[in-house]
Amino acid sequence: MKGYAMLKIGESGWIEKDRPVCGPMDAICKPLALAICTSDIHTLWEGAIGERHNMILGHEGCAEIVEVGELVKGFKVGDRVLVPAITPDWNSLEAQAGYSMHSGGMLAGWKFSNFKDGVFSEYFHVNDADGNLALLPDNIN
């Protein structure tokens, strides 16, 4: 699949990557509408979170679910969803203590374009789908 990535600090471009794999609590989504954020700019041009190589950018948007894990209860293939910038692991000790932004370590709740590929791609992975996605109502287009 194609994705728009930070190749290194100060350099971006289109790259090819494998389609993400869906875990039992996760979802694979296809973007419908995306938004660039100043965090993407700071990450790319200033290395705000350190050097990243071939890391697909983007961490906010709307999408259609194309695959769900067998333990996902609240979503199905074809659902349109809102995807937040912060997607913690809700079963982590940090999230349970109220620090979801730091689930798994400092800033580890901010996964897209930080610890894993972001949403500026043909498909992207959302961990813990039941806790990290919101259904987009049918009357909103």
Model regions: which residues?
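NAD(P)H dinucleotide-binding glycine-rich loop of Rossmann-like/cofactor-binding domains
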Residues: 89-141
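Short structural boundary motif marking the start of a folded domain
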Residues: 1-4
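Residue-level recognition of beta-strand termini and adjacent short loop/turns
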Residues: 8-10, 23
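Cytochrome P450 core scaffold surrounding the K-helix E-X-X-R motif
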Residues: 39-45
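Short, solvent-exposed secondary-structure boundary/capping segments
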Residues: 41, 74-76, 103
